[in-house]
Design a protein with these regions (language model features):
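Glycine-rich anion-binding loop/nest that anchors nucleotide
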Residues: 129-135, 158-161
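Gly/His-enriched, cation/cofactor- and phosphate-binding structural elements
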Residues: 130, 140-141
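A short alpha/beta connector and helix-capping loop motif
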Residues: 19-38, 48-53, 58
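Long, charged alpha-helical interface segments
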Residues: 65-94, 98-104, 118, 124, ...
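Short acidic, Gly/Ser-rich segments with clustered Asp/Glu that frequently serve as metal-coordination loops
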Residues: 1, 8-20
Length: 203
């Protein structure tokens, strides 16, 4: 698809898009995604220190010297209210910046699926591209399940036609929708996060 004519929805359930959604719900001024740690630092240097919070991770671990990591729990509260959030993550922020030419771009997770659908319903003349950020370039269960939820609803509510990949994601979601939390805990990335102490981000 030509991304410049499409509405792109980037999904990184564990954890970038969940973190971004949480930060916005907590009243941050804006979220600025960065492709790399170096770019995040360069972006931060363009603002007064009191105006931003610098967040990021590599391999799930907070970046040394940054204010916050990539746990949604860290962005739920007054620390981010009124601040610019500059964030660089292993998977999600790269996917967001890659599709910057899109007609419009949204970030999605299970937390904001209803809001994303409400926004998408205004674009009935557009193609929708669901981007699963994955894990280090690999397939991941959690993003595919969320994509399946959105693909199902887009087909039902906007009449969008599914690609084969979207259809597979939809079928997977239909099969597993009653056990999403269990699937998140069992999937590769979820299990990895639990193993390094971030079980609260998975549940």
């Amino acid at each position: 698809k030509d991304a410049s004519r499409s509405v792109v929805v980037v999904i990184d359930v564990l954890r970038a898009t969940s973190t971004i959604v949480t930060a916005l719900a907590s009243g941050c001024e804006e979220v600025i995604p960065a492709e790399s740690i170096e770019e995040a630092i360069a972006l931060a240097n363009g603002y007064k220190r009191s105006d931003y919070v610098l967040g990021g991770e590599r391999r799930g671990v907070p970046v040394e010297g940054f204010d916050l990591g990539n746990s949604p729990q860290e962005y739920d509260g007054p620390r981010v209210a009124g601040k610019k959030i500059i964030i660089a993550t292993t998977n999600g922020t790269n996917a967001i910046t890659e599709y910057g030419v899109a007609r419009d771009i949204f970030v999605a997770c299970f937390l904001n699926a209803d809001a994303v659908m409400e926004a998408c319903r205004a674009y009935k003349d557009s193609d929708f591209v669901l981007v699963c950020s994955g894990q280090d370039g690999r397939f991941c269960m959690e993003d595919t399940l969320c994509a399946g939820l959105l693909a199902t609803r887009l087909a039902e509510e906007t009449g969008a036609e599914m690609s084969d990949a979207a259809r597979v994601a939809s079928l997977l979601y239909q099969q597993r929708k009653e056990s999403i939390e269990d699937e998140l805990l069992r999937c590769d990335h979820g299990a990895y996060l639990v193993g390094i102490g971030y079980e609260q981000d998975v549940r």
